[in-house]
């Protein structure tokens, strides 16, 4: 039996309440909107944030900051993840991390290695960025961190 084949419990499904369909329905005439006023009319209610003519909060507060569209966002991989998922002597790259599901679904600018946890295995890791503490831990365990060289778009040609 599948979920879509389970029958409904008798008396459990209530039909939609159709308003404005005569006095016998219990919701005729005003259709539950009360008498007159802006809320009773068609065409919607005031827009969200409207404060009755008073200057809205969103316009009273000053503008601040900006959104940096060239900002790079990195997927974080911890040293303890390498200890947990990889054997000594293995080479770890983006493909290996992705196969284990460590990179997540969202594609980001690159991979950054951080120093959370401990490592005892000598592993070679290919990443875009790494913290100084992470590099120190990897080298202390006999491993190596290889950083990807990114070409400078405004560099000398």
UniProtKB/Swiss-Prot annotation:
Q: Which domain of life is it from?
A: Bacteria
GO terms for biological process?
translation
Q: Which InterPro entries match?
A: Ribosomal_uL15, Ribosomal_uL15/eL18, Ribosomal_uL15/eL18_sf, Ribosomal_uL15_bac-type, Ribosomal_uL15_CS
Q: What is a single Pfam family found in this protein's UniProt entry? A: Ribosomal_L27A
Give the source species: Magnetococcus marinus (strain ATCC BAA-1437 / JCM 17883 / MC-1)
Name of the protein this chain belongs to = Large ribosomal subunit protein uL15
Free-text function comment from the UniProt entry: Binds to the 23S rRNA.
One GO CC term, this protein: cytosolic large ribosomal subunit
Q: Key word Isomerase present in the record?
A: no
Complexes and interactors = Part of the 50S ribosomal subunit.
Q: Which family does it belong to?
A: Belongs to the universal ribosomal protein uL15 family.
Signal peptide start-end: none
